[in-house]
Amino acid sequence: MDPETCPCPTGGSCTCSGECKCEGCKCTSCKKSCCSCCPAECEKCAKDCVCKGGEGAEAEAEKCSCCQ
């Protein structure tokens, strides 16, 4: 497995390392800022991020609860 990728099952927890990049992550909890649903500007609060929302440009802004 590539060290910069990790499994992020839908509805599962994201417990990968800080260097990890989760592709297409749809986690219910995100302990690290690795989840793609947490935009870069929300990295500081991604610790408690809850990934939500659908796909597409409009949904991007609504995906990450830590941005609210």
Swiss-Prot record:
A divalent metal cation 6 binds at residues 38, 42, 45, 67. One of its GO terms (cellular component) is nucleus. The modification N-acetylmethionine is found at residue 1. A divalent metal cation 5 binds at residues 35, 37-38, 51. A divalent metal cation 4 binds at residues 34-35, 45, 49. Binds heavy metals. Contains three zinc and three copper atoms per polypeptide chain and only a negligible amount of cadmium. Keywords: Acetylation, Copper, Metal-binding, Metal-thiolate cluster, Phosphoprotein, Zinc. GO terms for molecular function: cadmium ion binding; copper ion binding; metal ion binding; metal ion sequestering activity; protein kinase activator activity; zinc ion binding. A divalent metal cation 1 binds at residues 6, 8, 22, 25. This is Metallothionein-3. A divalent metal cation 7 binds at residues 51, 64, 66-67. Residues 1-30 are annotated as: Beta.
